[in-house]
From Swiss-Prot:
GO terms for molecular function: asparaginyl-tRNA synthase (glutamine-hydrolyzing) activity; ATP binding; glutaminyl-tRNA synthase (glutamine-hydrolyzing) activity. This is Aspartyl/glutamyl-tRNA(Asn/Gln) amidotransferase subunit B. The keyword Lyase does not apply. Belongs to the GatB/GatE family. GatB subfamily. It is an enzyme of class 6 (ligase). InterPro entries: Asn/Gln-tRNA_amidoTrfase_suB/E (IPR017959), Asn/Gln-tRNA_Trfase_suB/E_cat (IPR006075), Asn/Gln_amidotransferase (IPR018027), Asn/Gln_tRNA_amidoTrase-B-like (IPR003789), GatB (IPR004413), GatB_C_1 (IPR042114), GatB_Yqey_C_2 (IPR023168), Gln-tRNA_amidoTrfase_suB_CS (IPR017958). The lineage of its organism: Bacteria, Pseudomonadati, Pseudomonadota, Betaproteobacteria, Rhodocyclales. Allows the formation of correctly charged Asn-tRNA(Asn) or Gln-tRNA(Gln) through the transamidation of misacylated Asp-tRNA(Asn) or Glu-tRNA(Gln) in organisms which lack either or both of asparaginyl-tRNA or glutaminyl-tRNA synthetases. The reaction takes place in the presence of glutamine and ATP through an activated phospho-Asp-tRNA(Asn) or phospho-Glu-tRNA(Gln). It catalyses: L-glutamyl-tRNA(Gln) + L-glutamine + ATP + H2O = L-glutaminyl-tRNA(Gln) + L-glutamate + ADP + phosphate + H(+); L-aspartyl-tRNA(Asn) + L-glutamine + ATP + H2O = L-asparaginyl-tRNA(Asn) + L-glutamate + ADP + phosphate + 2 H(+).
Length: 484
């Protein structure tokens, strides 16, 4: 039976965070009334000329530096010719033979736990281009409306090599790229508004075969979950087609989230179908070394550098370091917690940020920037766990109280609610003696080899202590008494 290998390459359109469009002064703000943010250049009125947005070029330079690519000192804009109702000029200004960014790579963390591994995905190129307008179909009863607000919005199209071999790797790549463009401040990453959208080129081939299979491009994937579902379906569809003796035809397909299936949109075009040629209205883009050096000096610490620091300086696992650098806001919050709680508590700090805080933020639909529990408050809570003032279970109650604004600090909540842990050995021993005397059956079961009986006794002691006894001391004292 043939063993199949999946081959995936991804093209990503990242909308650049500029105030105005790439070749005009019209606003890029999202959500305005249709056709209220389209000027003469965007409408392609006769006689208008494009003027390149300097900020868009700087965004491209930042990206190139972030992925270790070559930032071309000379690049050329080209006309990509095709007809579509929401493309007024009849062509899109893009780049073809001489893009602004060439090469580079992104390092991914794929999977979790024992199955986690690191993978490097190479990038082919990244080039600047303008977005098209938008066709609206819902409200026009057999007709289509055209909204040109989006026309001319600056995009950076990022093209990967076909280095991914599973939907998990593709999603890990998309997540890493999404985090990076947000981290370096060139794109807000809002997938619902179309600021970050991916096309996945998918093919299959027999394992061991060097030649690529025929690819089909899944267009406009605007969520990581849909990306995984779409690729998984497409892979199985292609395998079934080949095994039933049919040939795969190169095509562009769409993913339907309602059915979980891909459906053909059109046969796939090649570059020659677009008749690219240099745009005569735009001079070649020249980027001097001094400009690149200036942008380099303004670059923040990158996610990969921060991951290495978290792993090296704080002893975190590769998975934890990767999760904590999913966004700059998360990484900054975590570092602020560690700065107060101390490096010795780095692992519990990581756990609280990644698990408890993340779950509560997700439940309430909040971003970490809007967390009701500040980094200082969380650090204070972790310090009280570390010095045995409270147990982990009690800490969860304190966290909820802080979240709900029931105290300014962990200490205040602990004092107000009388949650301080009982660490007095004599007091805990008295509770243990009471529980052993009242639970002879559990004692007998434990001595007969039933480990569950021990857990039941621990639970009884904690219940008697109203959850405030030090769990380790309870365990130790029970073992001593039962061994005697």
């Amino acid at each position: 039976m043939t063993q199949w290998e999946v081959v995936i390459g991804i093209e990503t359109h990242a909308q650049l965070s500029t105030v105005s469009k790439i070749f005009s002064g019209a606003s890029t703000a999202f959500g305005a009334e249709p056709n209220t943010q389209a000027c003469a250049v965007d409408l392609a009125l006769p006689g208008v000329l494009p003027v390149l947005n300097k900020k868009a070029v700087e965004c491209a330079i930042r990206f190139g530096l972030a992925i270790g690519a070559e930032v071309a000192q000379k690049s050329v804009f080209a006309r990509k010719n095709y007809f579509y109702p929401d493309l007024p000029k009849g062509y899109q200004i893009s780049q073809m033979d001489l893009p602004v960014v060439v090469g580079g790579n992104i390092t991914l963390q794929v999977g979790q736990g024992d199955k986690a591994y690191e993978k490097i995905v190479r990038l082919t190129r990244a080039h600047l281009e303008e977005d098209a307008g938008k066709s609206l179909h819902e409200d026009f009863h057999g007709k289509s409306g055209i909204d040109l607000n989006r026309a001319g919005t600056p995009l950076l199209e990022i093209v990967s090599e076909p280095d991914m071999r599973s939907s998990d790797e593709a999603v890990a790549y998309a997540r890493a790229l999404h985090a990076l463009v947000r981290w370096i401040g060139i794109c807000d990453g809002n997938m619902q508004e179309g600021s970050f959208r991916c096309d996945a080129n998918v093919s299959v081939r027999p394992k061991g075969q060097a030649e690529f299979g025929t690819r089909r491009e899944i267009k406009n994937l605007n969520s990581f979950r849909f990306m995984k579902e779409a690729i998984d379906f497409e892979v199985q569809w292609q395998i079934n087609e080949i095994e039933e003796g049919r040939k795969i035809q190169q095509a562009t397909v769409l993913f339907d989230p309602d059915t979980g299936e891909t459906r053909m949109m059109r046969s796939k075009e090649d570059a020659h179908d677009y008749r690219y040629f240099p745009d005569p209205d735009l001079l070649p883009l020249m980027i001097p070394a001094e400009w690149i050096a200036r942008v380099q000096g303004e670059m923040p610490e990158l996610p990969v550098q921060r991951r290495e620091r978290f792993a090296g300086d704080l002893g975190l696992s590769a998975y934890d370091a990767s999760a904590l650098t999913a966004s700059q806001e998360i990484a900054d919050y975590f570092e602020a917690v560690v700065a107060i709680a101390g490096k010795a508590n780095a692992k519990p700090c990581a756990n609280w940020v990644m698990v408890d805080l993340a779950a509560r933020l997700n439940k309430d639909g909040k971003d970490i920037a809007d967390s009701p529990v500040s980094a200082a408050q969380l650090a204070g809570l972790i310090q009280r766990i570390a010095d045995s003032t409270i147990s982990n279970n009690i800490a969860k109650k304190v966290f909820e109280a802080l979240w709900n604004g029931e105290g300014a600090t962990a200490d205040e909540v602990i004092d107000k609610q009388g949650l301080k842990q009982i660490t007095d050995t004599g007091a805990i021993e008295a509770l243990v003696d009471e529980v052993l005397a009242a639970n002879a059956a559990n004692v007998a079961e434990f001595k007969a080899g039933k480990e569950k009986a021990f857990n039941a006794l621990v639970g009884q002691v904690m219940k008697a202590a109203k959850g405030k006894a030090n769990p380790q001391q309870v365990n130790d004292l029970l073992k001593q008494k039962l061994a005697g």
